[in-house]
C-alpha cells in the first residue's frame, strides 16, 4: 500500500510489519520533502513514525481517541489520517496547521501547541467515556521533555487514583525537549532507559504470586500488605516511580521496532487500568543530519536535503532581537555576578544559549516549568540576586498567578523578557504573542516596556535589571531594525518616559514597541497626502508618559494608537483610560489585533489580514477622521 492511498488510519489494520515499515519510509520521505521546502518541525515527527503506525494498528480510530502532546510530533499522524495531499500546505496561509486542530480533522481529538497538556485531556476523555458507559480507548502520547511540566505530573497524580479506569500513557522518550531536558526526572529516565525491559513483569509477577502457597489469591485481607511487599521485592527499580503512582509500567521499549511496539500496545490495552508504556526513540530518526544535531533540527526553515544546510535568504537580515538580548545579557552577566538568566526549556529560542555556553553558573534551565521559573526567580530576588527570566510571551500565560501572587504583590525585582511578543507567523493561534500587554497591564507594581529597535532593547534591559521592582520587556520575533548596538555603556531610560519622533499638528499617533517603525512608515504616507502627524514612541505602557501624551492629545484632538497585541485591554485601552481619567473627551482610533484568533500564515500575511500594514493604516486613519485635504 502507498501512503498516498491512506484516507483513514484504520486502513493500517491487517498490514504486515514489512508493509508498515515501507509506509514508515514513505512518511519520512514526505515529511522531509515538505519541511525542507517550507520549514516546520522536523526532528520530533521523524522520531515517532514507527510508534504512530504501531499504535494505530492497535486502535479503531472511528471510536478510540489519541491526544498528542504539543503537536510537534504529530506530522506522521497527519499523514496517515487523510492529509497526504494537503501536506504541501503545512503551516501556510489557509493550509493545514503545524499543530493538531480539532476543526481540521475528526482525528485531531485535542488541539495543543503548549506542552504537558495531553495526559490531563486524555484522562478527561477517559472519565467522560466511563460516565457515559462507553468502552473506547483513550491514549496520551507525551515526550520526556513535556513530562517535566507540572501539569503532566498533576494528571499522573490524578490518574493513579483511578485503578479501574482503562487509560494509556505513552512516554515518547527521545532524551530531548527542544533542547536537552533537565532535572531529576530526566536523570531518572536516563537510568531507566539503560535498564532491561519491564514489559510484562507486572502481570507475570502477579500471576506468580497467586500460585505461591500461603500468599496467593486466597490471602486473608489483613495480610494483603505482605503480598504487596513481595511483589515490590520482585519488581526491580525500572519504572518504580510510575508503579508507585498507580500505573502499570511497561518498558523501556525500542521505539523503532514495529512488531514489538504492536505487541506491547496490545498488552497494555488488555490491562484495563492506567498503564504507562515507555518508548525510547531517536529524535530525527532516518535523517543523519537531524540525528546528529537534534537541537538544530527540532524545527527548521527551508534547507537543502542533500547537505542539510539552511537555504540562505535572498538578502542578508539584521541580527534578531533574541540574539541581541542574549549578547547584551551575557555582557551584563560578565560585569555583575548577581545577574542570573533563567529559561523554561527555550535556551536557543530566547538567546540564552550564549549565557549557557559562556557563564553556565549564571544560567538556569528549569525545563518546561514556567510557573516554577517565575517563583524561583521571585525567591532568588528576595536574597539579592537579579534574575532575568526569558520566556516566550505565549508561554508566560501559564504562570499568570505566579506573576501576580509571587512577584507583583510582593513588588520583587524580577526582570521578565517576553520573546516572540506579537504576531509570530506559521505556528498559529497557540503561539501568537498577542495577549501579554493585556494580561500584564493589570498586575500591581509591574513596569511594562517595549523597544522600537535593538538599541533601545539594550537600554531597556539595563533599565529593567537596575529597577527595584518587577519589569516586563516584550520583544518581537525575528530580525531587528539593523541599527547600531553597543557592547557596553548602555544608558538606562527614565521609567515611564516616552519620546516624540515626529512633530505634527493634524493627528497624534502613539505607538508601542514593534509598531513604532510601522507608525513612521504610516506617517510618511500621510505626509504624502499633506497630512501632518505627530508620532510618539510610548516605550512604556505601565506607567504611561502622562506629561507627554496629555498635552499633545489636548492640543491635536485626534489620537491613533498602534500596538501588535490584542485590542481588548491592551495599549490602546490604556490610552483611552488615561484620557478618560483626565476628562479629555476626544476621538481615539485604536489599531491592533481585534477579537480574533490569528491563524497560521507569514507575519506579513497576518498583518495584511488584520489591517496592520502601513498603507492600510494610513487609509484607515484618513477615513476614520475624514482627513482628506486639498493639495
UniProtKB/Swiss-Prot annotation:
UniProt GO MF annotations: 1-deoxy-D-xylulose-5-phosphate synthase activity; magnesium ion binding; thiamine pyrophosphate binding
Catalytic reaction list: D-glyceraldehyde 3-phosphate + pyruvate + H(+) = 1-deoxy-D-xylulose 5-phosphate + CO2
Keyword entries, A-Z: Isoprene biosynthesis, Magnesium, Metal-binding, Thiamine biosynthesis, Thiamine pyrophosphate, Transferase
CDD domains reported for this sequence: TPP_DXS (cd02007), TPP_PYR_DXS_TK_like (cd07033)
GO cellular component terms given for this protein: cytosol
UniProt binding sites for Mg(2+): 144, 174
PANTHER family linked: 1-D-DEOXYXYLULOSE 5-PHOSPHATE SYNTHASE-RELATED (PTHR43322), 1-DEOXY-D-XYLULOSE-5-PHOSPHATE SYNTHASE, CHLOROPLASTIC (PTHR43322:SF5)
Subunit structure: Homodimer.
Name of the protein this chain belongs to: 1-deoxy-D-xylulose-5-phosphate synthase
Amino acid at each position: 500500500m502507498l501512503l498516498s492511498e491512506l484516507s483513514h488510519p484504520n486502513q493500517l489494520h491487517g498490514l504486515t510489519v514489512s508493509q508498515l515499515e515501507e509506509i514508515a519510509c514513505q512518511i519520512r520521505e514526505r515529511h522531509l520533502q515538505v519541511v525542507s521546502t517550507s520549514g516546520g518541525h522536523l526532528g520530533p515527527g521523524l522520531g515517532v513514525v514507527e510508534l504512530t503506525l504501531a499504535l494505530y494498528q492497535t486502535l479503531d480510530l472511528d471510536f478510540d481517541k489519541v491526544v498528542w502532546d504539543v503537536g510537534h510530533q504529530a506530522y506522521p499522524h497527519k499523514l496517515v489520517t487523510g492529509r497526504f495531499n494537503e501536506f504541501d500546505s503545512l503551516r501556510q496561509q489557509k493550509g493545514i496547521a503545524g499543530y493538531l486542530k480539532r476543526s481540521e480533522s475528526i482525528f485531531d481529538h485535542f488541539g495543543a501547541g503548549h506542552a504537558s497538556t495531553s495526559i490531563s485531556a486524555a484522562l478527561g476523555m477517559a472519565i467522560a467515556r466511563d460516565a457515559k458507559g462507553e468502552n473506547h480507548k483513550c491514549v496520551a502520547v507525551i515526550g520526556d521533555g513535556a513530562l517535566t511540566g507540572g501539569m503532566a505530573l498533576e494528571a499522573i497524580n490524578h490518574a493513579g487514583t483511578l485503578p479501574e479506569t482503562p487509560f494509556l500513557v505513552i512516554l515518547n522518550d527521545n532524551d530531548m525537549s527542544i533542547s536537552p531536558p533537565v532535572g531529576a526526572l530526566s536523570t531518572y529516565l536516563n537510568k531507566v532507559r539503560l535498564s532491561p525491559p519491564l514489559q510484562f513483569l507486572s502481570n507475570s509477577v502477579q500471576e506468580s504470586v497467586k500460585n505461591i502457597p500461603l500468599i496467593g489469591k486466597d490471602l486473608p485481607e489483613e495480610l494483603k500488605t505482605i503480598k504487596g511487599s513481595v511483589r515490590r521485592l520482585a519488581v526491580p527499580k525500572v519504572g518504580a516511580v510510575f508503579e508507585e503512582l498507580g500505573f502499570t509500567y511497561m518498558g523501556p521499549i525500542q521505539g523503532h521496532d514495529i512488531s514489538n511496539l504492536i505487541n506491547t500496545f496490545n498488552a497494555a490495552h488488555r490491562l484495563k487500568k492506567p498503564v504507562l508504556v515507555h518508548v525510547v526513540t531517536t529524535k530525527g530518526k532516518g535523517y543523519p543530519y537531524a540525528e546528529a544535531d537534534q537541537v538544530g533540527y527540532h524545527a527548521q526553515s527551508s534547507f537543502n536535503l542533500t547537505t542539510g544546510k539552511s537555504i540562505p535568504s535572498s538578502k542578508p537580515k539584521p541580527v534578531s532581537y533574541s540574539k541581541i538580548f542574549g549578547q547584551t545579557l551575557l555582557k551584563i552577566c560578565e560585569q555583575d555576578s548577581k545577574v542570573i538568566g533563567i529559561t523554561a526549556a527555550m535556551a536557543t529560542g530566547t538567546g540564552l544559549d550564549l549565557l549557557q555556553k559562556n557563564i553556565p553558573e549564571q544560567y538556569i534551565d528549569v525545563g518546561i516549568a514556567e510557573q516554577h521559573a517565575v517563583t524561583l526567580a521571585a525567591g532568588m530576588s528576595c536574597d539579592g540576586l537579579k534574575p532575568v527570566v526569558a520566556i516566550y510571551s505565549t508561554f508566560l500565560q501559564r504562570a499568570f498567578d505566579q506573576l501576580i501572587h509571587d512577584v507583583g504583590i510582593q513588588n520583587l525585582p524580577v526582570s521578565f523578557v517576553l520573546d516572540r511578543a506579537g504576531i509570530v507567523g506559521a505556528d498559529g493561534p497557540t503561539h501568537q504573542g498577542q495577549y501579554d500587554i493585556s494580561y500584564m497591564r493589570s498586575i500591581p507594581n509591574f513596569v511594562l516596556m517595549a523597544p522600537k529597535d535593538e538599541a533601545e532593547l539594550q537600554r531597556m534591559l539595563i533599565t529593567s535589571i537596575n529597577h527595584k521592582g518587577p519589569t516586563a520587556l516584550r520583544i518581537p520575533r525575528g530580525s531587528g531594525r539593523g541599527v547600531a548596538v553597543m557592547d557596553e555603556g548602555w544608558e538606562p531610560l527614565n521609567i515611564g518616559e516616552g519620546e516624540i519622533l515626529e512633530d505634527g499638528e493634524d493627528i497624534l499617533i502613539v505607538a508601542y514597541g514593534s509598531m513604532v517603525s510601522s507608525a513612521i512608515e504610516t506617517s510618511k504616507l500621510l505626509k504624502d497626502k499633506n497630512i501632518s502627524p505627530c508620532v510618539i514612541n510610548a516605550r512604556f505602557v505601565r506607567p504611561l508618559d502622562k506629561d507627554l501624551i496629555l498635552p499633545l492629545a489636548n492640543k491635536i484632538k485626534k489620537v491613533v494608537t498602534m500596538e501588535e497585541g490584542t485590542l481588548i485591554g491592551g495599549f490602546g485601552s490604556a490610552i483611552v483610560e488615561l484620557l478618560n481619567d483626565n476628562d479629555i473627551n476626544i476621538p481615539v482610533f485604536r489599531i491592533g489585533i481585534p477579537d480574533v484568533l490569528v491563524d497560521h500564515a507569514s507575519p506579513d500575511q497576518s498583518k495584511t489580514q488584520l489591517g496592520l500594514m502601513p498603507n492600510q493604516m494610513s487609509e484607515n486613519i484618513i477615513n476614520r477622521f475624514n482627513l482628506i485635504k486639498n493639495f
